[in-house]
Amino acid sequence: MASTAIRLTAEEFAEKRFELADGGRWAELVTGIVVTLEPPDLSHGNAVFNLTKAFGEQTSRDTAGYACYELGLIIRRKPDTVLFPAVSWFNEGPRFGESDKVITDVMPALVVEVASTNDRRRDLRERIITWHELGVKLVWVIDPISERVHSIARGRTAEQLAKGDVLRAGPVIEGFQLEVGQLFAEPSWWKKG
C-alpha cells in the first residue's frame, strides 16, 4: 500500500483521482491521504464481472434498486476518508442518481468488497464495522482465493457461503439469488481450448 503525504478533501481527491497511476482506479483517500492499493488479479475482475451480470438481470426486474461500481463513498470528514468498494447497491433516492458520480456521501443498502489482495484483506473487519455504523444493511465479502462469500447483515451473525450455496440479499434486494459458484466461473470465451 503506497501513499502520498499531501492531505486532500474528498472533493480535491475526486478532482485529481484520474491523474494518479492507473487513473486512480485502485486509490482511496484515508484521513486525507491518498492510499494506492495493489492492483487486483483476474479473479477479482471475474467475480465482479459475474456479479455485474446478475445485478443487471436484477435491475431489469427491480423498479427501484441499482448497482454502482467503484463509486467512492465518503465515510468521514475533516480529515476526509473515501473508500471504494467494488459494488454499491442503492435502493433510495432517484433511480441511478449516484451512477455518474465519482464520490458520494449517500450510503448504499449493500456494499460488496472483494478480498483479492493482502491490503484489501487487511482492513476488512474495520471496513465492515464502518459500513454497518453508517447504515449499510448488508455487506458481502467475496473471497476469490477460497471461492467463498461472507454475507454480513447489520446486527446479525456472519454467514459463510461456498460453491453450491445460494447467495441472497434478503430484504435489501428482494428476490435476488445467485449460486456462489457462478461468481467464480470463468467466462466461456476465457477458457483455453
Roles of regions detected by a PLM:
Residues 1-193:
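Gly/Pro/Ser/Thr-rich low-complexity, intrinsically disordered segments predominantly at protein N-termini
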